[in-house]
Swiss-Prot record:
Keyword Cell membrane belongs to the record: yes
Organism: Toxoplasma gondii (strain ATCC 50861 / VEG)
Domain of life: Eukaryota
InterPro entries the record matches: ATPase_P-typ_cation-transptr_C, ATPase_P-typ_cation-transptr_N, ATPase_P-typ_cyto_dom_N, ATPase_P-typ_P_site, ATPase_P-typ_TM_dom_sf, ATPase_P-typ_transduc_dom_A_sf, Cation_transp_ATPase_P-type, HAD-like_sf
UniProt GO MF annotations: ATP binding; ATP hydrolysis activity; P-type sodium:potassium-exchanging transporter activity
Annotated transmembrane regions: 229-249, 255-275, 418-438, 456-476, 985-1005, 1068-1088, 1261-1281, 1288-1308
Signal peptide region: none
Protein name: P-type sodium-transporting ATPase4
């Protein structure tokens, strides 16, 4: 059967479209034998060269790394398509010619297959209600795509997923009857303005289609405007509680308190809005960095664009590992398969054809759908739907109607539980406090005339706000988001917020070798040819070693020399010629076996070997950066080494800067039969290309003649891992007088195979990646048989020999891949941090062990036999085709092994699962399609940002922007730092908040005034604490951050040690210091400490209110005491409030009497002259004289008409007496102390060492605490603000006293819990060493 059949032939022949190996909606046709057509492509146009099916997959021997595909696409999708049916092509054609055959196939059946589809709308009651989400949910999933929403729904809620798919299919069918599946291609193309299939859309048409159809975006929840985020800050229960308190204050005409609460809440909402928006923007930028790209054909050129820029009408090039960018119609399929599990739930890959196999089955096989994954082959598609018009977009819209579940991180959920517990306890305590205060008749001495119930409830509300850490989860989310943004600076893009916290408990890193632990920049250094009767051979008589020199990365200039002749002197002389550009003079120094001018048989053999490697590595090209003059390899790095080596044998494209003469691009001489190619994958460990020979029975300089007169017209070149390829080798070459030839008469003996295996082992132990180069001559009959094979595996099996080995061994090539700079140090840091590093590679075991030793993963004390294993050893009977060993045996092996070689993707999964069973938190790297399951199985999937496929990136939690192992370790360190900082500010906030509840409760129980008023509590928690808390989130990493073992995954953020040595001691010390400040402040400013003596400092008169017949108390005389320290006087003074009969109003005299006189009277000696004179005439008519003090008081039996009336001889209700003044001063002391306790706690909580050792490491802390201290000072000295917050200016010594109490708290925090904690840790360390000692001795 034809392997590449045009669609019109399929139609007329009635063949099943799924049968051919490759299917194309042809632009042209070409010769039946797969050779080049007569048409010529213009330079730079798509179709410059044919390419093999799936050739973008990995090259043999490559550790799961995926090649770069940009330039590869340019050669892959040729407009000069081969046809196995016959006819010749005419190059590029207009749309009417290029797709006429496909149009004919569909035109007659279009009307039959496209009946008017019945659109089904949701019946009443079938719709889903939108679910309102919290701020944390919005923020933590702000970068979650609708694709992830669909995937999550498919796994977690299959019923909702099934219903969404059903409803979408009913309204927008995807079967073969869909108009996009059955419409003739030229009509479909015309609809979108596509005029030429080979050249794609013009830029003008792209702009028009983008304007018409919009960007290719799966819309998430629209970014909320700032004003909406601001309003949402007022919807939390705690803020609503504050708003109720503010409204109640205004209703009771407490204008200052009500206005102040509104101002504080508004400022807090503004700050929260700013931080949430900043974090959301940070996550949006991270998400945009992970957005996939795709290759499209526009104006005749293949170009990489962002998926968002794809428009209907675009021709998109598809290859293995791509994520399909939009819904599209297949117009070419080269063994193209996609995985549509995202849409269908079925895990089986779907073969894509040009015609739908079944017109009634959903998801027609000639359509590719957005967000599905290309798992095999290659193809082209014509885009017909983008954005929300794609099938995944429509399904996602249906799912969104079902609401979205919470996406809180485990850390956030834990904090919610912690906050809820603390909040519940705090509310219960506060309710008890309020009840006790009311029952005991609590009255605020600073506001003696205020409603006592309102006062205590308002204070309770303030303390409730402070004690309930409802803002912690949001602050943590913001820290995680901004931490993820900071990780980008270290080249790690965290895609999912939970990974930030998970990184902190990572205990095992499973890393690929190539490109991660090593640079991934292969350099060919050794070539070993295999030849009988060679005049130049090594000691074994069969092989000969050659060296490539100079080896300057991807610089192709150089030669191939006898390895044994490359001593230091020879290398020095060759370098002189190299620097002078005298490449033709290499032979004057040492015979250059890569120079075509040399005609000796050995040179012919060497160049023929490199010719095979060059032809097989067709997907990789060399270029020179004009700005840096650096040589670059575009494609697969393993092939890059071979292409560079081939250039030193003068095979390659002529590139500016490549100064060697005699360069020849042999690809034109050996046309590649694209559809017969077998791409590399990790299970085959080899790849095959098929080429037409320019001359019958000659491959380069190797003669293929045999005694039977067979005519060989083609050859299959097989390149791959030696241990796999050598199993299929039968022949080798023999050197003759005229050149090498295949020795058909004598097969390779087992002894000869063992000699080659010994060479392979020798090179591997030198940390070289070794590839074997072989070929098999093919007749026309062989090529026809290859075409009849059903797939790539069958073609490879045929070429290797169905009944016997058929390959001709040419030689092996060894390439060095140097370790990345810093990898050894990073592995050492992992060891110090208690993180185990495992290397998983597809290389041979000797190569893997050698590299592991180079990077320090295996030390001189390690036994390679015990510490490394070939992954076949993880399977029953050492057969990788069998099942894995039982879990117990696997766990035992994986617990000790550091290096896994010849690993398959399923081995990675087994390794991850075994490590997780052992309690480890595992990070796994990967880059290929087959790595995706292992990445998902790991706790932290790490994809490569450069070499990684879209599939791997989509399955990962983190993408390395530089593909560097060092970046993983840096990300772990950053994750530990972020988690440590979260611990610090959670401890800071919890400790201070709980401390407030403690000293409030003790104050009420001890019959003391409240240490803080309501607004002071709000200021303390919403404004003053905020700045240090933010500064704690910016703390640099602790020195011991990477010297401690990983924390357990389920460890709570506040561990037992944090409670015992952090939170609890501080809450006790803070409560003690604040209460000490309050008690001493009250005593120094009033002479008393408790409420009853404080209230007794004023004398009261009881009047009856006429309208309500109730008693009202009025003050008429007060005395209070203060200890003063001035330049003139130090000691107690007595302050007095009295009713002045001369002025007829209540007056206050501070320092009315030196000393402390509780029983002062008008006759007390030393009384202020002003008072003596005022009372000299006694009390006037209408007032009485107090018999105890001699001061005036209201007349007995006085009645008042309302509560606002003031009886003659008494103070008005709003009068601020000396007792209230002293109480306010004492409370101002405790307020200042509370601020300084919490501010200095921010310094002590940063480290378990002495705080002064890290005092200056975070300038943000100094700024934050300066702001808090400044704001506090302003609250006590600025008029207006003073009255709002019930503070007052204090004498200098009281400021020092209040601040000093804060420093007492600091000293206690430093001298008691920290040394105890360090002592505990030292004992634990000694115990650990003691327990290890017997094991070491044993």
């Amino acid at each position: 059967m034809a392997a590449r059949a045009s669609a019109d032939k399929l139609s007329t022949a009635g063949q099943d479209p799924a049968t051919p190996v490759a299917q194309v909606a042809p632009d042209t046709s070409s010769s039946a034998d797969g050779g080049p057509s007569n048409g010529a492509s213009e330079p730079g146009k798509v179709g410059s060269q044919p390419v093999a099916a799936g050739a973008e997959e990995k090259v043999a021997g490559h550790d799961g790394e995926s090649p770069r595909r940009d330039s590869h696409h340019l050669r892959r999708f040729s407009s000069k398509r081969e046809s196995t049916v016959g006819g010749s092509g005419t190059g590029h054609s207009q749309l009417g010619k290029s797709i006429s055959s496909v149009s004919q196939m569909h035109r007659d059946e279009h009307a039959r297959l496209l009946p008017a589809s019945s659109s089904m709308s949701l019946a009443p009651g079938m719709g889903y209600e939108n679910v309102e989400t919290e701020v944390i949910d919005r923020l933590s999933k702000s970068h979650v795509s609708l694709k992830e929403l669909v995937e999550t729904a498919r796994q977690s809620d299959p019923e909702a997923f099934r219903m969404a798919v059903t409803l979408t299919e009913q309204s927008h069918p995807t079967s073969g009857k869909n108009r996009f599946a059955s419409l003739p291609i030229e009509e479909l193309a015309k609809e979108f303005g596509l005029k030429d299939m080979s050249t794609g859309l013009t830029e003008e048409q792209v702009l028009e289609n983008r304007r018409r159809y919009g960007p290719n975006v799966l819309e998430k929840d629209k970014s909320e405007p700032v004003w909406k985020i601001f309003i949402q800050q007022f919807l939390s229960p705690v803020v609503l509680l504050l708003l109720v308190a503010a409204i109640a204050s205004l209703a009771l005409q407490e204008w200052v308190e009500g206005a102040a609460i509104f101002i504080i809440v508004t400022l807090n909402a503004s700050l929260a809005t700013y931080m949430e928006k900043s974090a959301s923007n940070a996550l949006a930028k991270l998400a945009s960095m992970a957005a996939p790209g795709c290759v499209v054909v526009r104006e005749g050129k293949a170009q990489t664009v962002g998926a968002v820029d794809v428009v209907p009408g675009d021709i998109v090039l598809l290859s293995t590992g791509n994520s399909v960018a939009a819904d599209m119609r297949c117009i070419e399929s080269v063994e193209l398969k996609t995985n549509e599990a995202l849409l269908t739930g079925e895990s089986e890959d779907i073969s894509k054809t040009l015609r739908a196999k079944d017109y009634d089955t959903p998801f027609a096989t000639n359509l590719c759908f957005a967000s599905t994954i290309v798992t095999n082959g290659s193809g082209r598609g014509l885009v017909f739907a983008t954005g929300m018009e794609t099938q995944v977009g429509r399904i996602a819209q249906q799912l969104k109607k079902a609401g979205e579940g919470s996406r809180l991180t485990p850390l956030q959920r834990g904090l919610n539980r912690l906050g809820g517990m603390i909040g519940l306890i705090a509310i219960c305590v506060l309710i008890i406090v309020v009840v006790v205060a009311i029952l005991t008749g609590y009255r605020d001495p600073a506001h003696p005339d205020a409603d006592p119930v309102f006062t205590i409830v308002l204070v309770a509300v303030g303390f409730a706000v402070s004690s309930i850490p409802e803002g912690l989860p949001m602050v943590v989310t913001i820290c995680l988001s901004l931490g993820a943004r900071d990780m980008v600076k270290r080249k790690a893009n965290v895609r999912k917020l939970p990974a930030v916290e998970t990184l902190g408990c990572c205990s095992v890193i499973c890393s690929d070798k190539t490109g991660t632990l090593t640079e991934g920049k292969m350099t060919a250094v050794r070539l070993v040819t295999v030849c009988r009767n060679g005049k130049v051979v090594d000691a074994d008589g069969l092989t000969k070693s050659f060296g490539f020199y100079p080896t300057k990365g991807f610089d192709p200039n150089g030669g191939i020399f006898d390895y044994n002749a490359l001593d230091e002197k020879t290398k020095s002389n060759l370098m002189l010629q190299y620097r002078d550009g005298a490449f033709q003079d290499f032979d004057a120094v040492c015979h250059n076996y890569g120079n075509p001018a040399n005609k000796d048989p050995t040179t012919k053999l060497v160049r023929s070997v490199m010719l095979s490697g060059y032809l097989n590595s067709h997907a990789t090209t060399l270029s020179r950066d004009p700005d840096t003059n650096r040589w670059l390899a575009k494609g697969n790095m393993s092939e890059g080494a071979i292409v560079v080596g081939a250039a030193k044998a003068r095979f390659g494209e002529t590139v500016a800067g490549q100064e060697m003469c005699g360069m020849h691009d042999a690809k034109a001489d050996f046309p590649r039969v694209q559809e017969l190619e077998v791409p590399f994958n990790s299970s085959r460990k080899m790849m095959m290309t098929v080429h037409q020979l320019p001359a019958v029975n000659y491959f380069g300089d190797i003669c293929l003649n045999n005694t039977t007169g067979t005519k060989y017209t083609h050859c299959a070149i097989v390149k791959g891992a030696p241990d796999r390829v050598l199993q299929h080798v039968r022949y080798t070459v023999r050197e003759g007088i005229s050149g090498p030839s295949v020795e058909w008469e004598k097969q390779m003996t087992p002894e000869e195979i063992m000699k080659v295996e010994a060479v392979n082992l020798e090179l591997s132990e030198q940390a070289l990646r070794v590839l074997a180069l072989t070929f098999r001559p093919l007749t026309d009959a062989d090529v026809a048989a290859l075409r009849r094979q059903a797939g790539a595996d069958e073609r490879l099996k045929f070429a290797l020999g169905e009944t016997r080995e058929e390959l001709v061994l040419l030689g092996v090539i060894g390439s060095v891949d140097p370790p990345r700079v810093g990898v050894r140090e990073a592995i050492d840091r992992c060891g110090e941090a208690g993180i185990r590093v495992i290397m998983i590679t597809g290389d041979q075991r000797p190569t893997a062990v050698a590299i592991a030793k180079d990077i320090g993963l295996l030390t001189s004390q390690d036994d390679p036999e015990q510490q490394s294993i070939q992954c076949s050893g993880l399977h029953v009977d050492d057969d990788p085709m069998n099942e894995h060993l039982p879990e117990e045996e696997l766990d035992e092996i994986i617990a000790r092994v550091k290096v896994f070689s010849r690993a398959q993707p399923e081995d990675k999964i087994a390794i991850v699962e075994a490590l997780k069973r052992q309690g480890h938190t595992v990070a796994m790297t990967g880059d290929g399609v087959n790595d995706a399951p292992a990445l998902k199985a790991a706790d932290i999937g790490v994809a490569m940002g450069i070499a990684g496929t879209d599939v791997a990136k989509g399955a990962s939690e983190m993408v390395l922007l530089d593909d560097n192992f060092v970046t993983i370790v840096a990300a772990v360190e950053e994750g530990r730092k972020i988690y440590s900082n979260i611990q610090k500010f959670v401890c800071f906030l919890l400790g201070t908040n709980i401390g407030e509840i403690i000293y409030l409760t003790i104050a009420i129980a001890a019959s003391m005034p409240l240490p803080l008023e309501a607004l002071q509590v709000l200021f303390l928690n919403l404004m003053s604490d905020g700045c240090p808390a933010v500064a704690l989130a910016k703390e640099p990493s602790d020195d011991e951050n990477m010297k401690i073992p990983p924390r357990p995954r389920k460890q709570p953020i506040m561990t037992r040690d944090w409670w015992l040595y952090g939170n609890l001691p501080h809450t006790i010390f803070e409560a003690g210091c604040v209460l000490m400040s309050l008690a001493l402040g009250l005593y120094l400013c009033t002479g008393v400490v408790q409420l009853n003596p404080l209230h007794e400092q004023c004398s009261y008169f009881t009047a009856t209110q006429l309208s309500h017949n109730k008693d009202i108390d009025y003050r008429y005389f007060c005395r209070s005491f203060e200890y003063r320290v001035t330049q003139d006087y130090t000691g107690w003074v007595t302050h007095i409030d009295f009713w002045n009969p001369k002025t007829g109003k209540m007056e206050q005299v501070l320092g009315a009497l030196a000393g402390k006189h509780p029983n002062v009277t008008v006759e007390t000696p030393g009384l202020a002259k002003y008072i003596v004179e005022a009372m000299s005439d006694g009390c006037p008519e209408g007032v009485d004289t107090d018999s105890e003090t001699g001061f005036c008081m209201p007349k007995a039996g006085t009645k008042v008409s309302s509560a606002t009336d003031t009886p003659k001889g008494s103070a008005p209700k709003d009068y601020f007496d000396v007792s209230a003044r002293g109480a306010k001063m004492g409370r101002t002391c405790s307020f200042i102390t509370a601020v300084w306790c919490e501010m200095l706690r921010a310094y002590t909580v940063r480290t378990w060492q002495w705080f002064f050792l890290v005092f200056n490491r975070n300038p943000w802390m100094h700024l934050a605490c300066s702001i808090s201290a400044t704001l506090t000072s302003l609250l006590t000295i600025v008029p207006g603000i003073q009255s709002a917050f019930s503070t007052c200016a204090l004498p200098w010594y009281l400021y020092l006293f209040a601040i000093g109490c804060g420093f007492v708290n600091l000293i206690l925090d430093e001298l008691i819990p920290k040394p105890l904690y360090r002592l505990k840790k030292a004992r634990e360390a000694r115990a650990a060493l003691t327990s290890k000692a017997p094991a070491i001795m044993a």
